[in-house]
Amino acid sequence: MNRAQSIMSSVLIFFLLSASHIYSQSSTNYTFKNTSLDIVTDATGIAMGESSVANPENQAAYFENPAAIPINTGMQIFYNYRSHNWMALAENMKYFSAGGCITTSIGNFGFAYNQFSSGQIATSPTDPQINTEDVNRTFILSYSNSILKNLYVGGSVKLFNRSLSSNGSSYSVTSNNAYLFDAGILYMTNGFFTAEKIKDKFNAGASLQNFGSDYKEEYKAFVTETMTQKLPRFLRIGFAYQLNTTVGQRLQANVDFLLTGEYKRLLNPGDSEQNDVNYWGAGIEATLLKIVSLRLGGVASPENSILWDKGKFNLRYGIGLNFPLAVLGLSHPVTIKFDYAVMPINQTSFDKSQKSLYAFGVSLVYGKSVL
C-alpha cells in the first residue's frame, strides 16, 4: 500500500471514530448517544431490559433515576463491565463503571465513574505503532431522600467529556466538560398480599436526564474545527412489581419474582431522529433462596443497530449470584454479588462479527445480609 492509500485509510478510521463511535453522524442530524452518558453497563439492568427507573433493588438504578438509589442497604461498592467488541475493528471497545452508594441518616448517596474506550486501534496499515484511542467519561454524584411516606425524590450532577488521541499523528478530538443534571421521583407501596408466606410491593418511578450546559468538541486534523454536539435528554417512566413467596411445609424455601417495565423518550431529537424517539424495556427475574437469580428481558428501539432490529422486542438474558458471608459462619453482614448478562447481536455480517456481547458485575454489600 502506498503512502497516499495509508493516509486515506488513517483519515477514514479517524472520522469513523469521530462520528460518535459508530452511530451519530452530525451535530444537527443526530444526538450524541451510545456513550458512557447513556449506555447501561450493569449486567442486572441489561438482562432486565434496561428498565430500572423504578427498581432500587438494582444497585445501579440511580444511573436511570437518582431517586432510586438503593434504600436501607447500608453501603455498596461495585464494578461493571460491558463488552462492545462486536467486529474486528472494534475488538478492544468496551464500557465499564465503578462506584458505590450508601444509606445515611440524612439521605442516600450514590457516586460512579463510567467510561467508554475504543482501545488502541491501528490507523496505519504500514506502521503498527500508529494508533488511535477514543475515550469518553461520565462522573456521577447522586442524592435521594424521602419527602413523604413511601415517596422519594432525587437528583444527580454529572460531568461528561471526550478525548480522541493518536500516537504518531496529529489527529485529535477534545471537548469541554459538560455539566448535566438529572431529577427523579420514586413511589413505593405495599401490594395486595400481606400473608406471612406471600407479600408483594409495587413501585413507580420517573426521571428527567441530561439537562445542562452546552457540549462542544474541537477536531484537529488538517484543519481545526469546533462543533457543538447535542447530548441526549431523556424522559423515563416505569414500574417494578415484586412478589415474595415462601413455598413448602416442612422444608420451606423463598422464591421471589420481580417484573419491571420502562418507557424512555428522547426529548431533543436531531433532524434525522424526529420519528425515532420512543424506547421500551421490560424484564422478569426469578430468585431462589435469595441466592440465585435468573433474568430475561428485552428492549424495543426506534433505531437499527448491532444489538436490535428497529421496532422489535430484542431479547437478552442473565444470571445473578448472591453469596452472603453468613453461610461461612461470619457475623459481619457482608454479601458478595456476581451478575452476568448476554446480549445477542443483530448484525453479524461484518469482519469477524461476534454472535453476542456480554456484561458482568461484581459488588460488595455491607450492612444488610440477603439471608
Each model region followed by its residue ranges:
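Bacterial N-terminal signal peptides that target proteins for export
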Residues: 1-11
